Amino acid sequence: MLAASVLRLTLPLCWLVAPQPTQPERLFHSRDRSDLEPSPLSQAKPIADLHDAQSFLLKYGWSEIPSPKESAGVPVGFTLAQAVRRFQKANRLPASGELDSPTLAAMNKPRCGVPDTRLPPRAALPTPPALLTSLGLRPRARQKRFLQMLFPKPDGQQEDASDTGASRAFSKKTLTWRLVGDAYSSQLSGDEQRYIFRLAFRMWSEVTPLDFREDRTAPGTMVDIKLGFGRGRHLGCPRVFDGSGQEFAHAWRLGEIHFDDDEHFTPLSSDTGISLLKVAVHEIGHVLGLPHTYRVGSIMQPNYIPQEPAFELDWADRKAIQRLYGSCKGSFDTVFDWIRKERNQYGEVRVRFNTYFFRNSWYWLYENRNNRTRYGDPLQILTGWRGIPTQSIDAYVHVWSWGKDERYFFKGSQYWRYDSENDQAHTEDEQGRSYPKLISEGFPGIPSPLDTAFYDRRQQLIYFFKESLVFAFDVNRNQVLNSYPKKMSQVFPAIMPQNHPFRNLDSAYYSYAHNSIFFFKGNSYWKVVSDKDKQQNTRLPLNGLFPKKPVSEKWFDVCDVHTSTLNM
């Protein structure tokens, strides 16, 4: 059984600290690059024999570094067969321990240069220069530094998250990055590279509270994550790239990512070569503290898997990074289910719905079936909802009954009616009067601005919330009920004393996915006692509020991203 723990992927800083020109010359500017004569790509030497396989197993952590008393290339503590067997098992090959053709083929797959595993620690021993060369390291690299690269000690910025080898690499939530000016790729234009990297960082930001910002002006020592391309001996790094076909990139401790420019990196629109986006997302995962995993579907698999254009971070990758940096939190301006009618292949009308979360000028679509936000969200309200205010909406109400199907957005002292058929706000009503209208005109007796509102289909009432008061509005009579307004705590009493929002709700909505009403305030939510809850426990108060819970434990990955990446 493998007695090794996964290698911590936070390796020592290796970028040469040298003055950089304020505007370094780049390979590409805005000109066409067809006149350039690119240098021929170097090809990696394939792993073909026992010696190559030994070097591979050492380089990627499957066997231990030999001492001077042992012949170079012979693992310590584990035989070669044991190391091969462990590698085969991880790669879902028959664990024979024999260096057969399928095993050699697995070793020759394009892969990340970060080691896969870490064996039990041993005393620091000098390593023969020949072995360093076979591992892709410069012979002059000192053994102490080599061991630090493979087995880094925890520092003040790191904290173990679990026994999987993952460790938190940064203690702050806002991180800067830069594509180093003299280390652009010869494969793509500078604008393409930076766009791809912005998207790669955004994909991690969509599932964590981390905020990634490109910084092209600060001193290099102040930038958290630096990216660059090189060939062979590159960027002052002790690791030497092997040419096209095997190691395509590696990540280093304290925020460095190097890409082998001998590889055929391709842009988003290409279905050939190696996707720079996919490699970048993988290496950023290392810089943030995630190790390799051989789990199918993970972006952190060590080998490159081609022909996967629509890849995303899967559930386990999301949970792994959130164990290090936490889940996303934050209040919402409004939350609602958007109801739509569709006809199936038989012409039958089916009612569908999606949940939307609005915050500031952004919105997220929540896929209840998958229990996560839609890939690529958030988006700007401006681009998805035509004609309504572009930020800080107070409430959404869908009056839906046998005789009505009306949708309203509220902000300040005004409201807008939305046309779901044409996907835009109405500009005027049936009498030719223009929208937006004053809340006091369309909903007499309702104050403004509102905190929030929702429509209760059971009673055909709109509940409007203002500070500690609630107003029940009869949509059929177009008036507030005589006994209202009332205290929110009176209409929606707490089941547990003092466990109540009391005033200033952020949002309230009826969820068709959960058949329940929810109140939101800050990072918490309260579930309103439903008819089903009352049937199961008759002692529960009518419209009572169950104790609050964290929003992030029920609705996952509603995360902000940096404004520079909103329209990607």
Curated annotation (Swiss-Prot):
Catalytic residues (UniProt): 283
Result when mutating residue 225 to T: Embryos have congenital heart defects with transposition of the great artery, 61% exhibiting situs inversus or heterotaxy and 39% exhibiting situs solitus. This mutation corresponds to the pathological variant 'T-226' identified in humans
S-S pairs: 328-559
Group of enzyme by EC: hydrolase
UniProt KW Cytoplasm keyword: no
Glycosylation: residue positions: 371
Propiece span(s): 25-143
Modification after translation, per record: The precursor is cleaved by a furin endopeptidase.
UniProt Hemopexin repeat ranges: 329-388, 390-446, 447-495, 502-558
Cofactor: Zn(2+); Ca(2+)
Subcellular location(s) per record: Secreted
Chain's role: Plays a specialized role in the generation of left-right asymmetry during embryogenesis. May act as a negative regulator of the NOTCH-signaling pathway. Cleaves alpha-1-antitrypsin.
The protein, known as: Matrix metalloproteinase-21
Originating organism: Mus musculus
